[in-house]
Amino acid sequence: MTTQPSHLSVLLQESIDGLAIKPDGVYLDATFGRGGHTKQILSQLSPNGRLIALDRDPSAIEAAKALADDARFSIHHCNFSEMEDVLTSLELHGKVDGILMDLGVSSPQLDEPERGFSFMREGPLDMRMNPTKGQSAAQWLAHAEEQDIAQVIKEFGEEKFGKRIAHGIVNARQEAPITTTAQLAEIIDLAVPVKDKFKHPATRSFQGIRIYINSELDEIRTGLKAALNSLNSGGRLSVISFHSLEDRLVKRFIREQSRGLQVPHGLPIMQAEIDSHKAMKAIGKAIKPSSDELSRNVRARSSVLRVAEKL
């Protein structure tokens, strides 16, 4: 019997290797999910090690109860942008040896129709990573201006037919409320004039709406800064992204933190002074899944791992 994709953590070994685990160290899994990365980290920690996990999804918090008997482990129900508050309360801020961030929507979220993330499974049009907070996708689409819908789909979904799709959504909601994933997928399918044979026409639009509903890019920007502040000197940051918008943010952040002091060309200043302002250094190049992993887990196909170390 083969393992289903929903149980597979993407770039598991590579991301853990990037953390350079110290058996007695303190680690943070900023996106617990179903605990694949957490369990791998725990397997390398001594009884003196410690792992703090975060997740904003109540179902992930429920799944973490399976680790409740492990004294090295604790989980907190919050966004990863709030990690500094959690670590400060534990007196661990600035003392963390490694942080792992696995961005985007998780496989269990995609696989549960009632969560409303997937156009492949009919369910209520929700898309919230924390279904107890904020407005659902259905609620937003019911009242959003056509130009705002178009902008979200174009900017966050990188969908070139954003205006046509937004127009189709507004016309459709005048006939009946858009409350299910299947309804929205059909509206998008009808609006897209040219189909990509390798991708469902609703893929980009669903991504864009989901990113907007969950403020995902703002969360990443804040989370990356919080991670840098939370690490100790020599601590590692291991980040897995799943589409170009996420990876662009991670790549830019690491590059900016690795630059050092920016001074006008020709200004007489020592290289040591420039280097002293560097906050991080990149560890190796971006890592993508092996062909073997892709054969086992198609959802890994767009993933990218980047690792950096705090100086």
From Swiss-Prot:
Its EC number is 2.1.1.199. Belongs to the methyltransferase superfamily. RsmH family. InterPro entries: RsmH, SAM-dep_MeTrfase_MraW_recog, SAM-dependent_MTases_sf. The keyword Acetylation does not apply. GO terms for cellular component: cytoplasm. It comes from Pseudoalteromonas atlantica (strain T6c / ATCC BAA-1087). NCBIfam families: 16S rRNA (cytosine(1402)-N(4))-methyltransferase RsmH (TIGR00006). This is Ribosomal RNA small subunit methyltransferase H. Keywords: Cytoplasm, Methyltransferase, rRNA processing, S-adenosyl-L-methionine, Transferase. The lineage of its organism: Bacteria, Pseudomonadati, Pseudomonadota, Gammaproteobacteria, Alteromonadales. It is found in: Cytoplasm. Specifically methylates the N4 position of cytidine in position 1402 (C1402) of 16S rRNA.
